[in-house]
């Protein structure tokens, strides 16, 4: 077979004035088309992102729908996660993806499949549970042993040198135990993640009321109570955990301080007559007085606000729910005519458990969701993503608004 070839210079050259511009023009059109499509896509995505970020509640709702897409939910939006014996459930605490349950006779951890990850027989008279993140501490008020739990079970247990008054978990995972101690009117011991004591403070002259560790774990705050000039007052004492010398000591308020919580870089004291915000120098930076109203409940959120439930009378169902920022300013306020069984706050959300329904608000007390028929629910635990764990007599569910 014979092949013929043609030299390059024998091919027709074409019209350089016309052909070249036509080819370049086609490429420009394609590039412009892709450029416009890309720009339009970017603008749409930017608009969606801006809308979600502007409305943080909508962003959390989208995140919940993605995280719990496979969860089996009933018609109310609840996913049943845990089942347990009603006789062994007195106190509850969410523990990462698990649930800690404590009664007078048993301490348990149930994993996310409702399987028993840990179980121990105890002999408690006044059981109590406290949790933060993936760490919980169970104890008997007046007893001498604390059990520190992880989502997988027991992390460590310890016998403390005196009757336990209260115990809590700091943001860094350390455990703060307030207890009685011989020769003192109360003591605070801080334990690390393996149960070793890393700091201890004993109050020799005033009665210890409560204690807390700052969010970075570097400062211990203790509230003591004593009589000055014939009046009982609450005092704040601050220590750096790497030193045995007090940083500051100052009077906080007259009367009793019920709770002390880390708040931003300082602390918030929940007292008999108001809320007090304290810095690490012992100074009171802001206050919120109750103005003669009675304190029913208070929750200090890790989102840097406090939700306080006040009443004009010591008894009765009508209460005022108020949220307050770290400068003592009201963020929102509403009057509740229903009896409140439990109150919980986390992130930017507040959960209010009433006798007939669960209501979820944002920190400005705008109602976001309401769930009726909750008569079997004993406790509620708000989560920072806008969901809430509801613990009942024999089961616990996750409410996904």
PLM regions: where:
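Intrinsically disordered, low-complexity segments enriched in Gly and acidic/Ser/Thr residues
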Residues: 283-373
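Structural motif
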Residues: 54-58, 106-108, 144-148, 183-189, ...
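Sequence/structural signature of beta-propeller modules
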Residues: 1-80, 85-87, 401
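Non-cytosolic head/periplasmic domains of membrane-anchored proteins
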Residues: 117-223, 230
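Repeated scaffold domains used in trafficking and secretory/extracellular systems
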Residues: 31-32, 79-93, 122-134, 162-173, ...
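Hydrophobic beta-strand positions that form the internal "hydrophobic ladder"
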Residues: 99, 136, 174-176, 217-220, ...
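Solenoidal tandem-repeat scaffolds enriched in leucines and small polar residues
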Residues: 184-278
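A short beta-strand motif characteristic of beta-propeller blades
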Residues: 70-84, 113-121, 152-159, 196-202, ...
């Amino acid at each position: 077979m014979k092949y013929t070839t043609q030299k390059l210079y024998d091919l027709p050259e074409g019209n350089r004035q016309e052909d070249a511009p036509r080819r370049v023009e086609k490429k420009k059109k394609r590039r412009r088309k892709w450029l416009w499509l890309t720009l339009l896509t970017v603008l749409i995505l930017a608009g969606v992102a801006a809308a979600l970020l502007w409305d943080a509640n909508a962003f959390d709702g989208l995140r919940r729908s993605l995280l719990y897409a496979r969860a089996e939910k009933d018609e109310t939006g609840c996913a049943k996660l845990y089942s347990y014996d009603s006789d062994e459930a007195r106190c509850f605490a969410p523990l990462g993806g698990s649930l800690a349950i404590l009664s007078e006779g048993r301490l348990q951890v149930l994993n996310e499949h409702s399987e028993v990850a840990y179980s121990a027989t105890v002999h408690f008279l006044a059981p109590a549970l406290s949790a933060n993140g993936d760490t919980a501490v169970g104890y008997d008020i007046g007893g001498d042993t604390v059990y520190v739990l992880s989502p997988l079970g027991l992390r460590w247990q310890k016998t403390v040198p005196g009757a336990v008054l209260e115990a809590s978990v700091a943001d860094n995972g350390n455990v703060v135990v307030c207890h009685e101690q011989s020769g003192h009117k109360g003591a605070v011991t801080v334990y690390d993640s393996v149960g070793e004591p890393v700091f201890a403070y004993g109050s020799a002259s005033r009665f210890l009321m409560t204690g807390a560790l700052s969010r970075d774990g570097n400062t211990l705050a203790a509230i003591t109570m004593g009589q000055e000039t014939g009046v009982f007052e609450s005092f704040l004492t601050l220590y750096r955990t790497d030193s045995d010398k007090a940083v500051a000591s100052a009077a906080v308020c007259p009367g009793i301080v019920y709770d002390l919580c880390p708040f931003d870089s300082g602390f918030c004291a929940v007292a008999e007559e108001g809320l007090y915000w304290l810095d690490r120098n012992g100074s009171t930076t802001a206050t919120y007085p109750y103005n003669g109203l009675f304190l029913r409940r208070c929750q200090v959120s890790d989102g840097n606000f406090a939700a306080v439930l006040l009443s004009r009378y010591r008894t009765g169902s009508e209460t005022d729910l108020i949220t307050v920022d770290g400068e003592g300013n009201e963020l929102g306020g509403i009057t509740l005519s229903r009896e409140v069984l439990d109150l919980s706050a986390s992130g930017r959300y507040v959960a209010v458990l009433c006798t007939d329904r669960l209501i979820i608000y944002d920190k400005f007390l705008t109602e976001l969701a309401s769930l009726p028929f909750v008569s079997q629910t004993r406790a509620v635990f708000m989560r920072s993503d806008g969901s809430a764990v509801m613990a009942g007599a024999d089961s616990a569910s996750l409410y996904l608004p």
